[in-house]
């Protein structure tokens, strides 16, 4: 079973060094409140450590991932994702099995560009951020690694 990381960009590009912007481009996080899902690998973790003042990340659970797919993921044409679309395009029964296959590592969301609009766009969090986006999460801020608390933030941003 693959651990999926949910990564959200929380700061803009102004005054960011070129290597930060370049790494965020590689992660496909071009704008504020964009999110992507990647498997937890040493390469991804290295990139996240490099850009940690601009993103927050953590392990996403299957329920939040399913909700994210249903509410915010769009098809290549801009429509909402449905069971019929997933069955037609990916040859997968429904969204539940798609989530299961994402966690088993059989399919990767970041490699499905031709079927979905990626990255996934989110709203700003309802109620605002609880801390400053200029401080790390462990010091009552918002950026950096936050573990399974990413699910709570994503639900507030859908």
UniProtKB/Swiss-Prot annotation:
Keywords from the UniProt entry: Ribonucleoprotein, Ribosomal protein
**Entry keyword Ion transport:** no
Gene Ontology biological-process annotations:
maturation of LSU-rRNA from tricistronic rRNA transcript (SSU-rRNA, 5.8S rRNA, LSU-rRNA); translation
Question: What domain of life?
Answer: Archaea
GO molecular function terms noted in the UniProt entry: RNA binding; structural constituent of ribosome
Please give the Pfam families that the UniProt record associates with this protein. Ribosomal_L30
Q: Does the keyword Ribonucleoprotein apply?
A: yes
Record-linked InterPro entries: Ribo_uL30_ferredoxin-like_sf (IPR036919), Ribosomal_uL30 (IPR039699), Ribosomal_uL30_arc (IPR005997), Ribosomal_uL30_euk_arc (IPR035808), Ribosomal_uL30_ferredoxin-like (IPR016082)
Which stretches are transmembrane? none
What's any one GO cellular component for it? Answer: cytosolic large ribosomal subunit
Alphabetical list of NCBIfam families matching this protein? PRK06049.1 (NF004711), uL30_arch (TIGR01309)
Subunit composition? Part of the 50S ribosomal subunit.
PANTHER family (alphabetical): 60S RIBOSOMAL PROTEIN L7, LARGE RIBOSOMAL SUBUNIT PROTEIN UL30
Tell me its family: Belongs to the universal ribosomal protein uL30 family.
Q: What is this protein called?
A: Large ribosomal subunit protein uL30
Q: Which organism is it from?
A: Saccharolobus islandicus (strain L.S.2.15 / Lassen #1) (Sulfolobus islandicus)
Upper taxonomic classification of the species? Archaea, Thermoproteota, Thermoprotei, Sulfolobales, Sulfolobaceae
């Amino acid at each position: 079973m693959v651990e999926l990381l949910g990564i959200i960009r929380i700061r803009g590009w102004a005054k960011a060094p070129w290597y930060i912007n370049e790494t965020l481009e590689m992660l496909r996080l071009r704008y504020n409140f964009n999110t992507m899902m990647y498997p937890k690998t040493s390469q991804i973790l290295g990139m996240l450590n490099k850009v940690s003042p601009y993103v927050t990340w953590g392990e996403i659970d299957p329920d939040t991932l399913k909700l994210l797919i249903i509410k915010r993921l769009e098809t290549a044409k801009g429509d909402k994702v449905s069971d019929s679309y997933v069955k037609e395009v990916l040859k997968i029964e429904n969204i539940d099995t798609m989530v299961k296959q994402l966690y088993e590592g059989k399919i990767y969301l970041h490699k499905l560009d031709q079927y979905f609009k990626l990255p996934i766009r989110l709203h700003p969090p309802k109620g605002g951020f609880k801390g400053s986006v200029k401080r790390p999460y462990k010091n009552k801020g918002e950026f950096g690694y936050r573990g399974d608390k990413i699910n709570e933030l994503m639900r507030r941003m859908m």
